[in-house]
Regions:
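Short intrinsically disordered, low-complexity segments
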Residues: 204-205, 226
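Flexible, low-complexity linker/loop segments at domain and module junctions
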Residues: 214-228
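Glycine-rich N-terminal segment of FAD-binding domains in flavoprotein oxidoreductases
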Residues: 229-234
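Intrinsically disordered, low-complexity, mixed-charge
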Residues: 1-193, 200-202, 209-211, 220-221
Length: 234
C-alpha cells in the first residue's frame, strides 16, 4: 500500500482507559501525526477513528500502546478499516455514548501527584492550599462515579459547574487538566467546613465556612486541648 494514501482506521481500547487522561493523550497523538478523526468514551472503553497517511495511522497505533498515560491499562485493542471521510479537517473529542450490556473498568482514586502538590504549595497559585486540587494524573475517580461512560455529568462533580479559569484549563490541549472531568478550584469546587462541639450540641448543621488556614488553626487548637477531629468524606 502507498504509505502516503489516505486511510481511516477505528481503534477500540478496553481496560482502564476512562478517567485516566486517555482521550487527551489520543488527541495529542493524533495532532502530532497530522491525523483527523474523533475519540470518545463508550461503555466498551474508548473508540477512536483516525484518518491520514497510512504510515502515520500505523505509527499512531504503535504509539497508542507504547506511550500510555501513567494511570491507563490496556486489556484489549480492536482495529477496523473504515472508508475515508471526505473533507474532514480536524480531530475532535466527541460526546460519550453508551450501550446496555457492556462494562468498562473504572479507575481507582489516585493520590495527589507532585505537580498538584506544587500548585497547593505555591502562594501565587489559584489552588494554593486547596485540598481538592487534582489533574488528569491524580484525584478521585471510583468514589465519585455514578455510571459509565465516565464524564463529569455522571459523577459527583456534576454539582459543581466549572468557573471560567477551570473551563479554560479543561479546554486547553496543552494543559495537564485538559478534559480532566474532576477538575476543581476554590472558586467552583467542593470545600470543607469546620463543625465545633458547640455547633453539634446546638444542632447547627450548616456553620459558617472557614478558610483552609482557619481550619488548620482550629484543628490544631482542638488537638492541643485533647479534643477529637472527625473527617467526614460524605
Amino acid at each position: 500500500m502507498n504509505e502516503k494514501c489516505t486511510v481511516r482506521r477505528a481503534f477500540v481500547a478496553s481496560g482502564q482507559v476512562q478517567g485516566v487522561g486517555f482521550r487527551p493523550f489520543v488527541y495529542r497523538l493524533a495532532h502530532e501525526g497530522g491525523l483527523t478523526g474523533t475519540v470518545g468514551n463508550t461503555s466498551e472503553g474508548v473508540r477512536m477513528e483516525v484518518q491520514g497517511a497510512e504510515a502515520e495511522v500505523r505509527r499512531f497505533g504503535q504509539r497508542l500502546q507504547a506511550e500510555l498515560p501513567p494511570l491507563a491499562r490496556l486489556t484489549g485493542l480492536k482495529e477496523e478499516e473504515l472508508p475515508p471521510v471526505a473533507q474532514e479537517d480536524a480531530f475532535a473529542i466527541v460526546q460519550s455514548s453508551g450501550h446496555a450490556g457492556h462494562s468498562v473498568l473504572v479507575s481507582p482514586d489516585v493520590g495527589v501527584c507532585a505537580d498538584c502538590l506544587a500548585d497547593m504549595a505555591d502562594p501565587q497559585n489559584p489552588r494554593y492550599n486547596y485540598p481538592f486540587t487534582n489533574c488528569t494524573n491524580c484525584g478521585p475517580r471510583y468514589t465519585i462515579t455514578r455510571s459509565i461512560p465516565y464524564d463529569r455529568a455522571v459523577t459527583s462533580m456534576s454539582c459543581f459547574p466549572l468557573c471560567p479559569r477551570c473551563a479554560a484549563e479543561y479546554a486547553n490541549p496543552a494543559d495537564r487538566r485538559f478534559h480532566a472531568q474532576h477538575v476543581a478550584c476554590p472558586v467552583c469546587g467542593p470545600t470543607l467546613w469546620f463543625v465545633g462541639k458547640e455547633d453539634a450540641a446546638a444542632g447547627r448543621t450548616c456553620p459558617q465556612w472557614v478558610s483552609v488556614q482557619d481550619k488548620e488553626a482550629l484543628t490544631r487548637l482542638a488537638l492541643e486541648r485533647s479534643g477529637q477531629v472527625l473527617l467526614d468524606g460524605g
